[in-house]
Regions:
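Catalytic cores of nuclease domains that cleave nucleic-acid phosphodiester backbones
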Residues: 70-199
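Metal-dependent nuclease catalytic regions and adjoining charged, substrate-binding loops involved
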Residues: 205-213, 217-290
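Charged, glycine-rich intrinsically disordered N-terminal tails and low-complexity linkers that flank
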Residues: 1-85
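Generic structural signal of hydrophobic/aromatic residues within well-ordered alpha-helices
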Residues: 27, 31, 41, 45, ...
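Short glycine/proline-rich turn/loop motifs
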Residues: 64-66, 197-202
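Residue-level preference for long, well-ordered alpha-helices that form the structural scaffold
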Residues: 108-111, 115, 204-212
Length: 290
């Protein structure tokens, strides 16, 4: 990590009266309507039970849900394995990478090998574009100056999270915050039944492209508002990218895909999203107490 470019700060959740801490992942979860797992599984069962070509052929609703759960656990493990590899490349040396490949038997794991190839190809392009690695997996926090009133109480709040990686381009003087994705796809186009996000984000479709963008913009806000970057508090100096490193090639033959933000940065909009999420958290928590 370059101490000259990044000022690490210790994030502590201090107990303060009527002060709410909320993670960015919780913020994002409040933006989407709850997933109706049982309902979707039922429709999947009805559409595929008698189809011998379907992976859900002769599967019960319970078995379908179990399949989804198992698939999610496997994807999560591969995501962790990829993060470990990225750490070896960015923070280690060639021997660290060799040891990783040996321990994970990457030669005989086609899925992990593809995740790795996707990262290697992207990182090669990134370096050729003039970007140097700064740091990775750092905790950040954004304490809003705004207050939230519910009933006769006023609340303050802090949003917390951890970004994947930060790079810097000496030629342009610009930073780049990256969020790695390794499972599923980045949905950029709505389908027939795609709804909208909730609260102030209802102007956007319920696509992960929008929620991932919101996540990255939180990191950007936290880095700048906390003065964690060298010589800049200007939002124009920090770019963000969603980088998908899946287990398969895309239609164009590329092993990875880099996505620009789904919408333009707007701090007022982000503040409204954070305030919405905090209000929702307070109200939902109060219902649990009752």
């Amino acid at each position: 990590m370059s101490e000259e470019l990044f000022k690490k700060r210790e994030i502590k959740e201090e107990k303060r009266e009527n002060h709410i801490y909320i993670s960015i992942s919780q913020v994002l979860s409040y933006l989407s309507a709850p997933f109706d797992q049982q309902g979707v599984a039922k429709r999947t069962y009805e559409n595929n039970f008698n189809n011998p070509e379907s992976q859900y052929y002769q599967k019960t609703i319970e078995e379908i849900i179990e399949m989804w759960s198992a698939k999610g656990e496997v994807s999560m493990q591969y995501g962790k394995n990829l993060d470990e590899y990225i750490g070896c490349v960015l923070e280690g040396d060639e021997s660290d990478v060799e040891l990783y490949n040996l321990d994970h038997d990457t030669e005989n794991d086609s899925r992990l090998s593809h995740h790795i190839r996707a990262f290697d190809e992207f990182y090669k392009v990134l370096k050729s574009s003039g970007y140097d690695f700064v740091t990775r997996e750092q905790d950040v926090a954004y304490e809003s100056k705004n207050k939230i009133k519910i009933g006769d109480k006023e609340y303050t709040f802090t949003v917390i999270g951890r970004f994947d990686a930060l790079f810097y381009n000496k030629e342009t003087g610009r930073y780049l915050v990256i969020d790695w994705k390794s499972s599923g796809s980045i949905d950029t186009m709505p389908k027939k039944y795609t709804g909208n996000l909730l609260g102030p984000a209802k102007i956007y479709k319920d696509l992960n492209w929008y929620t991932y963008t919101t996540q990255l913009y939180f990191y950007k806000t936290a880095l700048l508002e906390s003065n964690m970057l060298k010589d800049t508090t200007d939002y124009k100096d920090v770019d963000v990218r969603i980088v998908n490193l899946p287990d398969h090639d895309f239609e164009d033959g590329n092993p990875y895909c880099s996505y620009s933000p789904a919408y333009h940065y707007n701090k007022d909009f982000l503040d409204s999203v954070f305030e919405f999420a905090v209000k929702k958290k307070i109200l939902l928590d109060s219902k649990k107490i009752k």
